[in-house]
Amino acid sequence: MIERTFIKENVMETLVDEYLKNKLPRAGYSHMDVKKTPIGTRITVFAEKPGFVIGRKGKMVKELTETIATKYGVNKPQIEVKQIESPDLDAGVVAQKIASSLERGMHFRRVAHSAIRRVMAQGAKGVVVIVSGKLTGERSRTEKYMEGYMKHCGEPSEELVDQCHKIAKLKLGVVGVTVKIMPPEITLPDEIVIKDVPSKTTVETVEE
């Protein structure tokens, strides 16, 4: 019973996430966080432009709340919106921008390189972009692009690397977009920082 409930909740979150992505193309939607509370379900929406999530006089956020409750069966949803301060360092925003560009017909290689340049320009330690699916023909393939330093496994990868997966719906089929970003402010467990030792100035008094 617990397993069924867990699966049902995961499916619901996936469907709501896809709904928000399609409903908020101009908001710079990244991801959402769902938490159950004693009075309902709190859904925190992370976006580059919160104004597009709220809408004029709260019209959009009201529509989102009603749809999530009626169509997806979420118990008393309460939507909270948080702005992403550095969108080019947010894996969700970057992945969504790549997916949207692919859906507009832009070449995957050009889109990936452009995204990597923007991320690294913000001081990221490293970034990985993976695009997989039917990119140019009937055969599926995976393209991986990387710059800088990246932890691929272990605890540092899980806790320090921001990663997100989005999909782009193209004529040839669905293309997966995965972005991993190692932010500039983190310190790795095996990173050694060498500090400069300030030189001491000795003052000697000479008596005449």
Swiss-Prot record:
PROSITE patterns: KH_TYPE_2. The keyword Ribosomal protein applies. Gene3D superfamilies: 3.30.300.20, Ribosomal protein S3, C-terminal domain. Keywords: Ribonucleoprotein, Ribosomal protein, RNA-binding, rRNA-binding. GO terms for molecular function: rRNA binding; structural constituent of ribosome. One of its GO terms (cellular component) is cytosolic small ribosomal subunit. SUPFAM superfamilies: Prokaryotic type KH domain (KH-domain type II), Ribosomal protein S3 C-terminal domain. Pfam families: KH_2, Ribosomal_S3_C. NCBIfam families: PRK04191.1, uS3_euk_arch. Binds the lower part of the 30S subunit head. Belongs to the universal ribosomal protein uS3 family. This is Small ribosomal subunit protein uS3.
